[in-house]
Amino acid sequence: MTQKKLLVSNSEITRCIFGSFDKHARRLEEAFGVRIFNRADENGAGDCIVIEGEDGAASRAHDALSYMKKAASLGDELSDQSVDYVIRMISDGAQNELAELDDDCFFVTARGKPVKAKTVGQKKYVDAINKNTIVISTGPAGTGKTYLAVAMAVKALRKDNPKNTHFKNWW
């Protein structure tokens, strides 16, 4: 049985990580077969999230919680869907790809909300838009294709770089 700790300096971030009624923590416990609980830091510097479980499981849960801490500290909302995505990526051994997602805020809305790829597939799509003149994308509805394409187009227009942004009047 291994015990790992994650220090969190802000209790609001801890609340975001654990989720309402600790649902995110319970989801992580079920997925990785660990026990997660929160204690006050011994030095009084915030909270200490403690993970207990087998070596590999505790490490995976620690990686997931570290990513969630980083996302929460950047102001991202940790939804049930995003927590499930983190669990799936960590379980598949894709920690490095997951870590790259938060590094790419490519646009900020008028209300100050950062626009960035939330999945590895979206990151590949944004990279393809940046590298290619034309990108044709297909996929299930609701996966962010149009949202990201419009955000990238507005970004190009704001940079006074409309030469790579073509809008065709279809009517």
Regions of interest found by a model, annotated:
Residues 114-130:
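Pre-Walker A adenine-sensing motif
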Residues 137-139:
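Hydrophobic anchor at the beta1->P-loop junction of P-loop NTPases
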Residues 144:
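Conserved glycine(s) of the Walker
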Residues 148, 152:
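Hydrophobic positions on the alpha1 helix immediately C-terminal to the Walker A/P-loop
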